[in-house]
């Protein structure tokens, strides 16, 4: 019997890097709502009392970047100076310019179907049948713990919690399947007057126990709740935040490889984002079709070129079909040119801010999470 441990982490919506991601995607969504063909590469930096929004944007639309940044910070929960950050009073600096014409000439074409990739790069998509959402268990439950922290903070159950938090879960795998949770780490920002005893009991009862499946938790499971003790100073006062610094949290928690490109703040002409979504869509449908228990798909592109420069598939010995058979199947059923995948997933619309916290994958309301191709794939193999 093969037995090993695997660990993934997540962070809350109030983590500094996630504040930056959400502001970048708030700007993107506001622009796409008015101009679906806009070219957006929006980067954000946050630190005590300051938000800096920069990047390259080409659009016919006007949006109030300052108001979008402030509202995003307030929606996350930073509304008072005693939290170290206040959306109403922080400085917002705007350093946005236009997209380079050199890039634009490689993307836009007279025939839209010949739209070139916005950059070179390699992207990965992954799926596994170990959870109902066809995602790895460690990242799935690390996200759910963080979502529960946000829920009890906002609904008043634990109103002394603050927005900044992190989780980390270590799972025991036997023969490639999760069988138990070995370790849970949860650190959450809190109000200054809360004792560690009160915090640890409340976090265990209100956050951890309601989320983790009972069959995976035992007397051997270790829990580390705020293991350093006091966590009052957090958010941008504790650390600066930057768009695109949580790419493993955003994807598969380290279970799959990553091409290196971040997602937030980028319109769908940027294959860093759109092709990673398409790769997840393909991998998930292959697993949903029963053609593999695990599947990792890699796609690569050249700037200005429509067709992918490569497609490869690894099923880790869980498929009865060869890589060549599966790639041929993918080519028949999925158009992975930039124009094709944007059309296939209907990506030129304001759907991105919701992805900027708690992961871009494993959420059934998103187009790249649908398994509508599974039956056709199964019938055609």
Curated annotation (Swiss-Prot):
GO terms for molecular function: ATP binding; magnesium ion binding; methionine adenosyltransferase activity. Gene3D superfamilies: 3.30.300.10. Binds 2 divalent ions per subunit. K(+) binds at residue 43. It catalyses: L-methionine + ATP + H2O = S-adenosyl-L-methionine + phosphate + diphosphate. Pfam families: S-AdoMet_synt_C, S-AdoMet_synt_M, S-AdoMet_synt_N. NCBIfam families: metK. This is S-adenosylmethionine synthase. The gene is metK.
């Amino acid at each position: 019997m093969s037995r090993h441990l695997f660990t993934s982490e997540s962070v809350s919506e109030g983590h500094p890097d996630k504040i930056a991601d959400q502001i970048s995607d708030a700007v993107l969504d506001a622009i796409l709502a008015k101009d679906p063909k806009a070219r957006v590469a929006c980067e954000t930096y946050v630190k005590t009392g300051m938000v800096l929004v920069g990047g390259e944007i080409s659009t016919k639309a006007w949006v109030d970047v300052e108001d979008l940044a402030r509202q995003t910070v307030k929606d996350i929960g930073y509304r008072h100076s005693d939290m170290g950050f206040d959306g109403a009073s922080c400085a917002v600096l705007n350093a946005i310019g236009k997209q380079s014409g050199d890039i634009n000439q490689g993307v836009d074409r007279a025939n839209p179907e010949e739209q070139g990739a916005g950059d070179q790069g390699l992207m990965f998509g992954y799926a596994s049948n170990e959870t109902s959402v066809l995602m790895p268990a460690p990242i799935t439950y690390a996200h759910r713990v963080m979502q529960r922290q946000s829920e009890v903070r906002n609904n008043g159950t634990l109103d002394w919690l603050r927005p900044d938090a992190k989780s980390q879960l270590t799972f025991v795998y036997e023969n490639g399947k999760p069988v138990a949770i070995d370790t849970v780490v949860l650190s959450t920002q809190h109000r200054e007057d809360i004792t560690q005893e009160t915090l640890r009991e409340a976090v265990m009862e209100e956050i951890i126990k309601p989320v983790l499946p009972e069959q995976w938790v035992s007397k051997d499971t270790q829990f580390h709740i705020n293991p350093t003790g006091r966590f009052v100073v957090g958010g941008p006062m504790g650390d600066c935040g930057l768009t695109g610094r949580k790419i493993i949290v955003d994807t598969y928690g380290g279970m799959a490889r990553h091409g290196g490109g971040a997602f937030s703040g980028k319109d769908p002409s940027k294959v860093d984002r759109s092709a990673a979504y398409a790769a997840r869509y393909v991998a998930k449908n292959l697993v949903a079709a029963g053609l593999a228990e695990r599947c990792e798909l890699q796609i690569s592109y050249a700037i200005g070129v429509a067709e992918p420069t490569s497609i490869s598939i690894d099923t880790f010995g869980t498929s009865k079909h060869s890589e060549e058979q599966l790639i041929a199947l993918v080519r028949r059923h999925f158009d992975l040119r930039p124009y094709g995948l944007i059309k296939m997933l209907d990506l030129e619309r304001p759907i991105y801010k919701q992805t900027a916290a708690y992961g871009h994958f494993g959420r059934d309301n998103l187009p790249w999470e649908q398994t509508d191709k599974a039956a056709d794939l199964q019938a055609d193999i």
